[in-house]
A protein has these predicted regions:
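Fungal secretory targeting signals
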Residues: 1-25
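Structured recognition/catalytic domains enriched at protein termini
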Residues: 19-189
Length: 189
C-alpha cells in the first residue's frame, strides 16, 4: 500500500515537473504551425507543443541541426502560421489580457512590450511591468494576470503592417533562469 502511494506521489511530481508555468490565454497568442516547424525543427516544436506554457529553455535543450529560428522571439512561433489572429488596433485603444498562471513558484520579473519582429527589440518603454512577478499581489484582484494595455501613440508607422510588431508578454524567472513568452500580432490603423 505504501509503495502504491509513493508511486502515485512520484508520478504526480513528475507530471508537475513537466507541466508549464504561464501563458497568455486572452487574446489568443501566436501558436505553432507548419512554418514554425520548418524554421525551428521538429524536436524544438515537439517540446513547445507538449507544454505550451513551459520555459523556452526546455525546447532549446532539444535543438538539433534542424533548428534555424529565434525561439526567444515569440517562442519561435511564426507570423505565417498566425495570420487569422492578427489584431487591428488604433492608437489609444485598450486591450484586455488574461494570463493562465499554471505554476508560479519561480518568481522573477515580467513585462508587456511592443517588439519589432525584425530586431526582437522593444519599441519604447514597456506597456506594463512587474518587478516581482508573479508574487507581486496575492489578489484578487490581480493586475498581473488580468490587466489592460493601451496602444501608445509613439509607434509612428513602424507597426502599421501586420507582421512587423507584436505585443509580447515576457516573464523571466530569475531563480531558475527560465523564459516564458506569449506574442500577439497586430497592426495600427
Amino acid at each position: 500500500m505504501l509503495s502504491s502511494v509513493l508511486l502515485q506521489a512520484a508520478l504526480l511530481a513528475l507530471v508537475s515537473g513537466v507541466t508549464g508555468h504561464a501563458v497568455v490565454a486572452e487574446p489568443p497568442p501566436r501558436k505553432t504551425g507548419p512554418s514554425h516547424e520548418a524554421a525551428c525543427g521538429a524536436a524544438v516544436v515537439d517540446v513547445l507543443e507538449n507544454d505550451i506554457a513551459g520555459p523556452i529553455e526546455n525546447a532549446m535543450a532539444k535543438a538539433d541541426e534542424e533548428y534555424n529560428c529565434n525561439a526567444y522571439l515569440c517562442r519561435g512561433y511564426q507570423f505565417e502560421d498566425n495570420t487569422d489572429n492578427v489584431l487591428e488596433v488604433s492608437v489609444g485603444e485598450v486591450l484586455y489580457f488574461h494570463v493562465d498562471l499554471i505554476a508560479g513558484h519561480h518568481p522573477g520579473y515580467a513585462n508587456v512590450s511592443i517588439v519589432d519582429t525584425s530586431t526582437n527589440e522593444a519599441i519604447g518603454d514597456p506597456l506594463r511591468s512587474w518587478d516581482d512577478w508573479p508574487n507581486h499581489l496575492s489578489g484578487p484582484p490581480r493586475d498581473d494576470i488580468d490587466y489592460n494595455v493601451t496602444i501608445p501613440a509613439t509607434l509612428g508607422s513602424s507597426c502599421s503592417e501586420a507582421g512587423n510588431c507584436v505585443i509580447q508578454w515576457y516573464w523571466y524567472a530569475s531563480g531558475n533562469k527560465q523564459t516564458y513568452e506569449s506574442c500577439h500580432d497586430f497592426y495600427v490603423v
